[in-house]
């Protein structure tokens, strides 16, 4: 079942810069895009310098927000391509006043141009969709 587009989605996404990073090269050809470097500086992004964990395909953010709540001594970067569900995850993080979680809007294949080598402690893949419907046909 397809989720209904959230009301004022564009405005809400724009107002979420305190929790959101948007991939710049998501529209480029994958092979060209991974050659570009947009490496994230985790010391700049997160308020505290502590280990960074990565969740790919965070959806509505239940795992990421719970992880951040239970582990204040760890940072988590949650990746999601669907802005419609990502805004729900951001809203929940804001409601919980979490300062150790950030969200990256984009697809996983572009991550090598954003994540510095040897900077992630662990990667979590919780029910991420391996084949989006249109590209799998």
Which residues fall in each region the model found?
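Short alpha-helix immediately C-terminal to the canonical SAM-binding loop
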Residues: 86-88
């Amino acid at each position: 079942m397809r989720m209904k587009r959230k009301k004022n989605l564009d405005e809400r996404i724009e107002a979420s810069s305190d929790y959101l990073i948007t991939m710049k090269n998501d529209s480029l050809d994958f092979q060209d895009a991974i050659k570009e470097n947009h490496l994230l500086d985790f010391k700049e992004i997160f308020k505290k310098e502590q280990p960074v964990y990565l969740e790919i395909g965070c959806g509505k953010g239940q795992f990421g927000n719970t992880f951040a709540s239970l582990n204040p001594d760890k940072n988590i970067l949650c990746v999601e391509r669907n802005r419609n569900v990502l805004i729900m995850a951001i809203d929940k993080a804001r409601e919980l006043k979490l300062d150790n979680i950030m969200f990256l809007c984009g697809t996983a294949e572009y991550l090598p141009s954003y994540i510095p080598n040897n900077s992630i402690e662990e990667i979590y893949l919780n029910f991420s969709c391996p084949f989006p419907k249109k590209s799998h046909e």
